[in-house]
Amino acid sequence: MILKLKDGEVKIKLFSDIAPNHVKRFKTLADSNQYDGVVFHRVIDGFMAQTGDVEFGNSTNDKYDLARAGTGGSDLPDLKAEFSNLAHEKGVVSMARSSDPNSANSQFFICFVDAPHLDRNYTAFGKVIEGMEFVDKIKRGDSQSGSVSSPDKIISLRSVQ
């Protein structure tokens, strides 16, 4: 996958052998342009950058509402957890969810650092293999909540052909 950010392109390797349903969802949403223009609504320095709210977080959509970004998802059903032994280390891409382990839908995050407390609690399904320096430049939010007032956004996200 190629994730275009304001500072450059990020190449993400997906692990369909570990989390086939999450990889399929990620590719489906990306290749139908649903992630384009979606903001990084929660970015915590020393932890991760969260994005992927295609409902309220898409800055090009009529439903865009930064205050509600992070509460929405796609019109597809939630996914069942696909926990694995893939460690949440720097550059790992994982699906965000509510307190229900089977509630992942469209939101995802990229780890800035190792986050072992997430291991086997969130579905990791990919890893940044090039361009992590551009992920590291994503605008950070409030130190407590991670809320970003004028957030960076995904320019585009597509499968590599």
Placement of each model-derived feature along the sequence:
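Cyclophilin-like peptidyl-prolyl cis-trans isomerases
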Residues: 1-161
